[in-house]
Amino acid sequence: MTIVHPAQPVNGLNPEDVFYAVDDLGTQAGYGFILYQYQPGLYPDCPVNLYFSLDGDPSARYLLFGALVARARILQAANPALRTRLYTSISPADIQLKDFYLQNGFDCDETDNILQLTIPFGDGRIPMSCTVAPTPLHTWDEQQGLLYRLKVNEITFVDLDYLQSLMRMPHFMTLGLYRNAMLIGEVIMAGQGSDCELVAIYIEPGSRNQGMGKALLHRMMAIMAAEGVTRITTRIMSRSIPQQRLMNDFGATVLGVNMIFPGMYLS
C-alpha cells in the first residue's frame, strides 16, 4: 500500500492536499483531502482550521490518516504563530470511527448542534444610525453578490443552488443591516408553515461586538413571527464562542447533535 497525489488539482484543491491510497495491484483503496480555512470571526481563539476527509478500506485508513496529519503539520508550520486545529466530521452514530480518532489522540468535544431559539417580544431596537431592509435577490448578479459577502464573512456552505432552493420556500427573507447607508450585516431565514430556520447571519468585522447581530436577528424573528412562524431552529458549531453568545441572547436550547467533529490542536 502506498500514497500518491493526483497530477492535477481536484475540485479546486492543490494536488499536494489530495491523497490516494493504492494497493500493490494499483487499485485505489482509499481517498483523502485536507482543506485550509482561515476563520478568525468564527473561531477567534483558533483562527486556522484544517478540515480533512478520509474514506476507504480499513486497511488504508492508518496510512491515509498519517499522511493527512503530516500534511497538516506542514501547513501549520507556515504560520506557527496562529493557533491551528485539525478536524474532520463523523456521524454521532459512528462509534467505530469515533473510537479510531480517540485512540489517535483526537478529542470529540466539538459538535454541530441543532438549536431552537426563543422568539422575543416586540420588534427589537435597531441601533442609532442604522436601518434594516430586505436584500434584493431578483437577478443573478444580486444573488452572486450575496454569496460573495457570505464567503468573505466565513460562511461558505451556501452556494447558488442552495440559495435558490431557499428562495422557493413560503417563508424566505434576507434582511440587511445598514449603518449610515453602508451594509454591515445580513441574516437569512427560510421555512414553511409555522417552522423556520436561521440559515446564516454575519456582521462585518468592524461592527462586531456592538450588539448588531442581536438587533438584526431580533428584527428578522419579529418579521417571521408576523408571518405565522412560531418555531425557529438553527445549527451552530459548539466550539464557536461568537455563535454561542448569540444563541444565549435568545435563550436557545439544544435539540440534538447533527455531527461530531473529532479534532486536535496542532499549536
Describe each model-derived feature in a short phrase:
Residues M1-P15, R125-F157:
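Short amphipathic alpha-helix that is part of the acyltransferase structural core
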Residues Q8-N11, G32-G41, I155-E204:
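A conserved beta-strand-loop-helix scaffold within acyl/acetyltransferase catalytic domains
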Residues V22-D24, P47-Y62, S91, I201-N209:
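A short, internal acetyl-CoA/4′-phosphopantetheine-binding micro-motif in the GNAT/acyltransferase core
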Residues A29-G30, E110, L183-G185, G256:
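A structural microfeature
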Residues D55-C130, N258-L266:
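Acyl-donor-binding surface of acyltransferase catalytic domains
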Residues P58-R73, I203, N209-A226, R245, ...:
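Conserved acetyl-CoA-binding loop-helix of GNAT-fold acetyltransferases
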Residues L86-S89, L198, I232-I236:
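Conserved hydrophobic beta-strand within the GNAT/NAT acetyltransferase core sheet
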Residues L97-Y101, Q243-N248, A252:
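Conserved active-site tyrosine of GNAT-family acetyltransferases
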